[in-house]
Design a protein with these regions (language model features):
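Flexible loop/turn segments at secondary-structure boundaries
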Residues: 24-28, 60-61, 130-134, 184-188
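Charged, often glycine-rich, active-site loop that binds/positions anionic groups
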Residues: 187-199
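A short helix-breaking turn/cap at a secondary-structure junction
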Residues: 40-160
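A short alpha-helix/helix-coil micro-patch that ends at or immediately precedes a cysteine
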Residues: 157-172
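Extracellular/periplasmic catalytic domains that process cell-envelope and extracellular macromolecules
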Residues: 10-11, 30, 40, 114-119, ...
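General small-molecule cofactor/ligand-binding pocket signal
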Residues: 175-182
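Glycine/threonine-rich beta-strand-loop-alpha-helix active-site module
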Residues: 23-49
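Active-site-proximal alpha-helical scaffold in enzymes
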Residues: 1-29, 64-68, 72-75
């Protein structure tokens, strides 16, 4: 992603946090690739003013931190009302009402870190990515080119990290559901009888 500088600098402890910009996934992807926390906000939560516009209808600021505690601390500072709208397409346009950051944010982001904060939330994890879908990648001629539609063999060290993450989510009150992933199956034809985007 285009925010790799922010991601790698934060991961290497060159700074306590980084500020990336995202249009598609260029804020989240560097965080995922460097083991960081990232937050992609809704429109108006973090001011975009002053950033280089790539696609003004999609651009958002994405902070990077090494821990969730750091992220919550940072959000308490950077999620603030910005009275100046020049340079911020969404807050400047008159047709879609964008609430002020103060109307959306909690009194304290740090207060969100309690043990039951995910109670009632459900996370869906595609079985094909955690070696739990025996049909994934078994089509006679899978995919639409390149490695698409082929079996994903996730290595044991990543599965161990997944199991730790799953335990943490459940401990925080979340429900974790292992599920199929029709978007990939029906696009890439990854199993016998599955269509592809070309069919």
């Amino acid at each position: 992603g285009s925010s790799n500088g922010s991601g790698t600098a934060t991961a290497a402890s060159f700074a306590a946090f980084g500020m990336g910009e995202e249009t598609w996934s260029s804020g989240r992807a560097p965080a995922a690739n460097n083991g960081l926390c990232a937050y992609t906000p809704s429109r108006g939560v973090i001011s975009i003013r002053g950033n280089w516009p790539l696609v003004p209808t999609m651009d958002v600021v994405v902070p990077h931190t090494r821990t969730m505690a750091d992220m919550l601390e940072l959000l308490d500072v950077i999620v603030a009302d910005d009275p100046e709208v020049r340079g911020d397409l969404w807050r400047r346009q008159p047709w879609v009402k964008i609430p002020k950051a103060s109307d959306l944010r909690p009194a304290s982001y740090k207060a969100l870190s309690g043990s039951e904060r995910l109670k009632g939330k459900r996370f869906g994890i595609p079985a094909m990515y955690i070696n739990a879908d025996p049909l994934a990648g078994t089509a006679e001629t899978p995919g639409i080119g390149g490695p698409t539609g082929q079996r994903i063999d996730t290595r044991p060290s990543i599965i161990a990290l997944w199991e730790a993450a799953r335990a943490a989510l459940v401990a925080a009150g979340a429900e974790v559901v292992v599920t199929d992933f029709p978007l990939v199956t029906n696009y890439e034809g990854d199993r016998p009888g599955a269509p592809t985007i070309a069919t």
